[in-house]
Amino acid sequence: MTRQSWPAARLITATALLFGLMVGTGLYTFVYAKGYSYLTNDPQACANCHIMRAHFDAWTRASHRAVAVCNDCHTPPGLIPKYVTKARNGFWHSFYFTTGRYPDPLRITPRNHDVTELACRKCHADLTADIDPAHNASPRNGISCTTCHNDVGHIE
């Protein structure tokens, strides 16, 4: 091999390694880790991760089980916002699980709390419309549905 062909060989090798890494990561994510299940509305997908099992089991005993699945409360409406949220959350859930750095007990992020709060207000608009204005302000004003009703979706 001539000295001038080394850069081309390195580029081909680097490209092949990068491609192999991407394929390997994709196979791991979608086959071993059941990543395909997160593209559905099946609540069982949330229970794939053992740290979510208690939340899933609590949901199966809650009244919302009859009317809502995980995505109804934990992802925003609309195809693109829903899957952006699922991808973002999936990345961080995977990161924290892989590194062992997930908080115990689990805590909902402020962004995801806002999504859940807006879902409560959407489904229960007939009730929340008549509540005092402090309750109908921004979810981040300190008063939210879960301030008083934090165990409704997931009975402790």
Regions found by a protein language model. Give the residues of each.
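Short sequence/structural segments immediately N-terminal
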Residues: 2-156
